[in-house]
């Protein structure tokens, strides 16, 4: 084996030389080998070349044409090259799948081929010779501008030998595939999509104009990084002269997709000397309480919440204490007369108003892949004398960096839990009958939540409240109130990860039903940060359960729970950004005929970001944009706003209603909700899902009514419908005792087609009456 091709390659590498396996020599190999061993289509580009002490030989191993090359074991030795006496036998197995090589320069091997065929196939050059060639090349042509002018002025084409022609094509092929060259070309506004075309034109120009000396010097260096770095300055001169229109076009695109230095987007905030107070600590450490105290003391203030539910809770609490406070969320606007304080969701933050104190809750959400941009915008753009940040330590370092960039003063206040969270070593041993009063059992799927609820109520005397993300905020608040009330029989909570933030709950112990969840693609372990957030909900100062406990249902999950709680918070290195509409509008002007869905994708490819930021995911936006492409008459701004509507993109019914809303709006018609409503609570899982879906559609209508007020006039009717459905959902959860249905059964059990709202007037009167009673 060692005397065959693999042996020669191995000896060449062991002597620390570079190896070039050229396409031309593969042609020779084909011609000298029988057709039974080598297919006639063998002459295809198959090689790469790397200088230095590494070898890279690439073959398309999965291609039937290369079946003659087998994989084997080789024994390293050297009989022709001085290897400094290191001729010890080393047996090594060589793979064939990877296009890469490791730090030791592992070689893909060939076997069962006569060694004599390699005489003119393997060109071995020592590093010293390669270095001399590189030095000679750079010394002789040190000025790329001068070389380019010589090439441009040349009229006589040099006669190249066939081997030189092939070698030049190899070199330019390597240049075209160089990631370094493609990235550097962006600096002169040659985009990656146009880069191959530019290289092709440059290759033709160079081969036609270059002199024989330049060719020979380049061939000596070969398709290496040295050749790429030598050719690149000449390539730049060629592109600047040859493609001015393309460069100008791409520069305009890049300039409008520039998301670098986002702090400069808010000049009024930069003109202020802001004080940033970071309340850093775990759940149930009092950090948000202290920030809210400062919020209520201020002459005017803003509280920014990650959830509607939490914004509503602060709104109620502050008003109950006699401080007038308004509520702003995507779905509702409640302006309280004489109010100087506002509780809002973070997406509703206004960077135009001036505040004495602003509170940004759950600041670690800046790193959220979808919504992080809202926190980043608020932190950079709020015009407030004091901004209080509440969150865990994961984003502390990047907040320090952002404050250094903006010139804001940063004050850090660190907190610990009032009482440590205790892990119970004794789990529930897989038996839900072991739950106790005050327990919160956390499951990560809707099906599991209801299975747990029904099992507990069947085998124990406990009654369960239920909280999960698809429920309306009003229903979740009702379930939380039911659980916190000691005067009823509902003493166990079954919840999803939605329990991690947004509700004040009197939880004695958090029990994890499982520590795995479906991420939309596969089952994965729950992230440590999420485990800590949820487990930290146990125990609450001032409640009947001040001490927090946590454990798992199954013993096999306990070690992972302990590991997650002991693990420090991961340090965040980047936070989210997303362009404003004005930036999208400028970008669209550069590509006027592009569909909006493609526009967003194009923007994502060309936008420039600082190292501290990432572009937030916009899969949801793109899917809605694709659906709305068929709707004519929408302006760019209309499409932008419709795409951010809170729609469940996995729910065809919700998507259909969004399409219908957009179609009516595009025709300048009043947008109505053509939806009936059940008169009683759900009797099955299918009916419960139907109620959830209906409420989501109504919520979407209310959100759109705040974007397009004139065209969504039936707000009062929709609010009444939404309130009614939220109450029906609460009743349904209290009575839920049905068997969970499969997806097939759910399809069969779909509700009848909507035939319009059945009783709007009476329902509106009822809702008004209830509001009046509450005011009294």
Swiss-Prot record:
State the SMART domains in the record.
DEXDc (SM00487), HELICc (SM00490)
**What GO terms are given for molecular function?**
ATP binding; ATP hydrolysis activity; RNA binding; RNA helicase activity
**Compartments it resides in:** Nucleus; Mitochondrion matrix; Mitochondrion matrix, Mitochondrion nucleoid
List every stretch annotated Disordered.
80-101
Q: Name one GO cellular component term.
A: nucleus
Coiled-coil ranges (or none): none
Renumbered to this chain, the Acidic residues biased-composition regions fall at 85-101
- What are the entry keywords? ATP-binding, Helicase, Hydrolase, Mitochondrion, Mitochondrion nucleoid, Nucleotide-binding, Nucleus, RNA-binding, Transit peptide
Keyword Zinc applies = no
Give the binding site residues for ATP: 281-288
Q: What sequence ranges are listed for the domain Helicase C-terminal?
A: 427-595
- Transit peptide region: 1-84
The protein's matches in InterPro entries, at most eight in alphabetical order, are given as: DExH18_N, DEXQc_SUV3, Helicase_ATP-bd, Helicase_C-like, P-loop_NTPase, RNA-DNA_Helicase, SUV3_C, Suv3_C_1
Q: Which reaction does it catalyse?
A: ATP + H2O = ADP + phosphate + H(+)
Pfam families linked to this entry: DExH18_N, DEXQc_Suv3, Helicase_C, SUV3_C, Suv3_C_1
Domain of life of the native organism? Eukaryota
Cofactor(s) recorded for this entry are: Mg(2+); Mn(2+)
Example of a GO biological process term: RNA metabolic process
Q: Write the Enzyme Commission number(s) for this entry.
A: 3.6.4.13
* Function comment: Major helicase player in mitochondrial RNA metabolism. Component of the mitochondrial degradosome (mtEXO) complex, that degrades 3' overhang double-stranded RNA with a 3'-to-5' directionality in an ATP-dependent manner. ATPase and ATP-dependent multisubstrate helicase, able to unwind double-stranded (ds) DNA and RNA, and RNA/DNA heteroduplexes in the 5'-to-3' direction. Plays a role in the RNA surveillance system in mitochondria; regulates the stability of mature mRNAs, the removal of aberrantly formed mRNAs and the rapid degradation of non coding processing intermediates.
Family of this protein: Belongs to the DExH box helicase family.
Quaternary organization: Homodimer; in free form. Component of the mitochondrial degradosome (mtEXO) complex which is a heteropentamer containing 2 copies of SUPV3L1 and 3 copies of PNPT1.
Name recorded for this polypeptide: DExH-box ATP-dependent RNA helicase DExH18, mitochondrial
Q: What species is given as this protein's source?
A: Arabidopsis thaliana
